């Protein structure tokens, strides 16, 4: 048959079912082809694999062979086709055996990697990026001329088990350490498993490394060593120190970060050069875009933790009416939370860390600031903002000198005016009222220090803000029976007139006078602003109104109302008559604002700060506080002194209420006895002169009995 003059050339191809077909054609009239079929199911760790030799149905012309086959004819004359076929099969068997051993070894490592992972995949688990298969060019362990059409499309997740087809595809992939592989940009289009490799992507292209956030770095061509896996899975060797805010940020990132497919579209091919760094799921996205901080979420998380006894008793009942622009319950909850949070930034012991300052110095400074506000017609809100800034600054600062206290006070008023006023005074006006003690440059320099100490939080809800809300609720006649409608926001009718002031300005100023006097005392830092406003309403109006408008329990308001009682007595006796002429002209038109709120207060003179309190009034309050403190200490030392017996009941008086003649010392007993003896002598003399009168005898007897007990 002329087989001696013919050469045997074999080609191999991969079928869709995962089988490798090796064809050995021969040139001649009677040509025979040897097809080696290797089944994927027969691949195991053993070296003996079943090989089937099938005849090729169609002859292949000799012109299809390369010049290498012609050279092999000349070099090997006289070689039989059968022997060459056996040699070819043996070579292929050796290559397949070596590849099978490497593959089985890699499979064991992959299974070990899968078993070491913390989270086992459930049945039917499919990772997100498996929807679009990634192209992973292979590095062939054998000659590329023998296996040139093997294409691999292997998913790189460590938790996906390797099936038969992927095992067969892994035959052509050599096992190499991760350091030898370099990263390459992704292919813009996904490849089909059956499609041949394109000319521009040869076998020399390096595989793609895909990284996942907070997971192990896994590649299809690299089997990570056991020691490296243990280091990645075990975090006990590293120390992590997280804040509460950092933990919140990590939880938000885990929930909000989206898993993007590693296959890049043509539209985003310009970003394909950026590789995944630091475990980012999306290589093209910057790191700062993933780390998004949500202050609203932090606020809602912090609201779950109670911060004061008022919150521990339960949530405050919302007295607000239905609002068209927001949910009333949410608005009230945020207001209460902000008030509790701001109350922690102040303390009654704020002056203990300043040895050179006294509480009276703070009172003098605030009284001077009230006078400045009245001169420049600043709002009450401006003054109370300055008080808040001053107390918070003294709470965080250390060793403030008394010569700098006026500079701190005028700087607080300067910042508050810029926050609240529409037309704040110039900085030269603030420097002028200090009479040369502070310059403009000093105020500007200290403004930076003040804002840094306050952490740029300069918009709290002040006392006058809470007072306006409470009085507005009182005008709207909000009752506890109507509070339940807040839960049904859709069914409740929105009250658009609530945001416009409708209360009496005269009553507002009366209550503000009491709060102005209370502000001079450092004890106000013991209570939150909402509690202070509610306690003031309980004195000027009634306890029921304070409870209804504030939503607080009386157990929360009572300590503040008891502390405010001497201030109320002094302000009721010493306060001048309020010369406040309200010019509240009713809106005549029946459209626009007049239709929405017909009882609107058009005169805003009540919001201008007035100087109606003096230091003399504050001194009287201090004297009343000292007297009350002394009485309280006396009652605690001897509780019986507070008892008063009825007039009809004859009981001996208490020891503290006895006359002074019965409270003599032991040294005075001799004098008292000498006086008694002289009285007895006089009585005896008188009795002897009268000659036995019964009255004198009785007196003598009584005197002698008293002198000799």
Swiss-Prot record:
It is found in: Nucleus. GO terms for cellular component: cyclin E1-CDK2 complex; cytoplasm; microtubule organizing center; nucleus. Residues 677-709 have a biased composition (Low complexity). The keyword Disulfide bond does not apply. Isoform II is ubiquitous in early embryos and, prior to mitosis 14, is rapidly degraded in all cells except the pole (germ) cells. Expressed during G1 phase in proliferating peripheral nervous system cells. Constitutive expression in embryonic cycles lacking a G1 phase. Residues 228-258 have a biased composition (Acidic residues). The modification Phosphoserine is found at residues 114-115, 117, 129, 187, 192, 195, 198. Its main location: nucleus. Residues 1-30, 43-149, 162-205, 221-289, 642-709 are annotated as: Disordered. It comes from the Eukaryota. Keywords: Cell cycle, Cell division, Cyclin, Nucleus, Phosphoprotein. Gene3D superfamilies: Cyclin-like (1.10.472.10). Belongs to the cyclin family. Cyclin E subfamily. Interacts with a member of the CDK2/CDK protein kinases to form a serine/threonine kinase holoenzyme complex. The cyclin subunit imparts substrate specificity to the complex. Interacts (via C-terminus) with Z600 (via C-terminus). Essential for the control of the cell cycle at the G1/S (start) transition. Targeted by archipelago for degradation by the SFC ubiquitin ligase complex. This is G1/S-specific cyclin-E. It comes from Drosophila melanogaster (Fruit fly). The gene is CycE.
């Amino acid at each position: 048959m002329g087989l001696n003059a013919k050469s045997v050339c074999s080609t191999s191809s991969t079928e869709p079912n995962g089988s490798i077909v090796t064809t050995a054609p021969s040139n001649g009239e009677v040509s025979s082809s040897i097809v080696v079929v290797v089944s994927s199911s027969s691949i195991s760790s053993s070296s003996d694999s079943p090989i089937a030799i099938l005849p090729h149905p169609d002859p292949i012309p000799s012109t299809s062979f390369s010049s290498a086959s012609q050279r092999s004819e000349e070099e090997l004359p006289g070689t039989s086709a059968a022997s060459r076929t056996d040699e070819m099969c043996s070579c292929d068997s050796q290559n397949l055996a070596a590849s099978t051993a490497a593959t089985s070894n890699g499979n064991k490592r992959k299974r070990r990697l899968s078993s070491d992972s913390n989270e086992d995949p459930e049945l039917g688990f499919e990772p997100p990026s498996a929807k679009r298969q990634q192209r992973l060019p292979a590095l062939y362990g054998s000659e590329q001329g023998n296996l040139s059409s093997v294409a691999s499309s292997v998913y790189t997740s460590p938790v996906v088990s390797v099936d038969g087809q992927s095992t067969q595809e892994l035959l052509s992939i050599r096992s190499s350490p991760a350091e030898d592989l370099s990263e390459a940009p992704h292919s813009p289009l996904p490849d089909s498993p059956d499609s041949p490799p394109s000319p521009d992507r040869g076998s020399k292209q390096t595989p793609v490394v895909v990284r996942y956030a907070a997971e192990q770095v896994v590649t299809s061509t690299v089997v990570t060593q056991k020691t490296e896996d243990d280091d990645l899975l075990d975090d006990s060797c590293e120390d992590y120190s997280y804040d509460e805010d950092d933990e919140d940020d990590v939880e938000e990132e885990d929930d909000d970060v989206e898993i993007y497919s590693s296959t890049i579209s043509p539209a985003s091919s310009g970003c394909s050069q950026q590789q995944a760094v630091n475990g980012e799921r999306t290589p093209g996205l910057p790191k700062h875009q993933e780390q998004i901080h949500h202050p609203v979420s932090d606020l809602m998380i912090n609201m779950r933790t109670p911060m004061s006894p008022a919150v521990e008793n339960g949530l405050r009942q919302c007295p607000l009416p239905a609002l068209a622009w927001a949910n009333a319950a949410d608005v009230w909850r945020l207001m209460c939370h902000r008030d509790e949070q701001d109350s922690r930034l102040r303390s009654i012991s704020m002056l203990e860390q300043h040895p050179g300052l006294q509480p009276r110095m703070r009172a003098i400074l605030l009284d001077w600031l009230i006078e400045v506000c009245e001169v420049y017609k600043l709002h009450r809100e401006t003054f109370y903002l300055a008080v808040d800034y001053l107390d918070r600054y003294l709470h965080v600062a250390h060793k403030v000198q008394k010569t700098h206290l006026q500079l701190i006070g005028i700087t607080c008023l300067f910042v508050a005016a810029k926050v609240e006023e529409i037309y704040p005074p110039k900085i030269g006006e603030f420097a002028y009222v200090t009479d040369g003690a502070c310059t403009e440059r000093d105020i500007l320099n200290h403004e930076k220090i003040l804002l840094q100490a306050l952490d740029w939080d300069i918009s709290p809800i002040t006392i006058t803000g809470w007072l306006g809300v409470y009085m507005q609720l009182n005008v709207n006649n909000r009752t506890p029976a109507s509070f339940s409608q807040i839960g049904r926001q859709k069914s409740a009718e929105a009250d658009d007139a609530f945001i416009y002031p409708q209360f009496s300005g005269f009553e507002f100023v009366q209550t503000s006078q009491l709060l102005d006097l209370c502000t001079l005392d450092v004890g106000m830092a013991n209570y939150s602003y909402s509690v202070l406003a509610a306690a003031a309403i309980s004195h000027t109006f009634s306890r029921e109104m304070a409870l209804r408008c504030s939503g607080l329990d009386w157990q929360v308001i009572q300590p503040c109302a008891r502390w405010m009682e001497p201030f109320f007595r002094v302000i009721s006796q010493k306060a001048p008559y309020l010369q406040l002429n309200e010019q509240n002209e009713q809106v005549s038109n029946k459209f626009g604002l007049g239709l929405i709120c017909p009882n609107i207060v058009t005169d805003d003179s009540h919001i201008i700060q007035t100087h109606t309190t003096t230091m003399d009034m504050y001194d009287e309050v201090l004297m009343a506080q000292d007297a009350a403190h002394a009485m309280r200490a006396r009652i605690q030392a001897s509780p019986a002194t507070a008892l008063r017996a009825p007039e009809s009941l004859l009981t001996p008086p208490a020891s503290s209420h006895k006359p002074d003649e019965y409270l003599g010392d032991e040294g005075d007993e001799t004098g008292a006895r000498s006086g008694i003896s002289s009285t007895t002598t006089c009585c005896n003399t008188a009795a002897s002169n009268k000659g036995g009168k019964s009255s004198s005898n009785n007196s003598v007897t009584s005197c002698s009995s008293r002198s000799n007990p």
